[in-house]
Amino acid sequence: VVNASISGDTTAGGLARLDPLLDEHAPEVVILELGGNDGLRGQSPVQLKQNLARMVRKSQEAGAKVLILGMRLPPNYGQRYTTAFAEVFPKVAQETGAALVPFVLEGAAGVPSMMQGDGVHPTAEAQPVLLENVWPALKPLL
């Protein structure tokens, strides 16, 4: 298992770093949990979709199965933007054949004890919930 995440990273940053990581590690499975920071910065859902799709395709071309962990934004970003953002993850999964967890924080988001003070990042208490969300989609890829 290689954790190549960088705190605060966007899909553009992940895409820029992906090729050398694929070359170095030759993963069998790639889990992409990117996009939240794109959304929190108000970046274009169109660009998010393009970047995420490119990351999935590059990973698949390198021989990896891909799991996308979808995200959602707080409602203060407006209905139109949050809807467009949330639609990116299932669209990319459908277009690329990647596996999908629609919302990785399902059951934890909005629960104060399961989220850090920023309301964005999960706590240690939330990890069993995240496992329940991710494992059914991840297990078939292993």
What are these regions (language model features)?
Residues 13-142:
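Alpha-helical cap/lid subdomain in secreted, periplasmic
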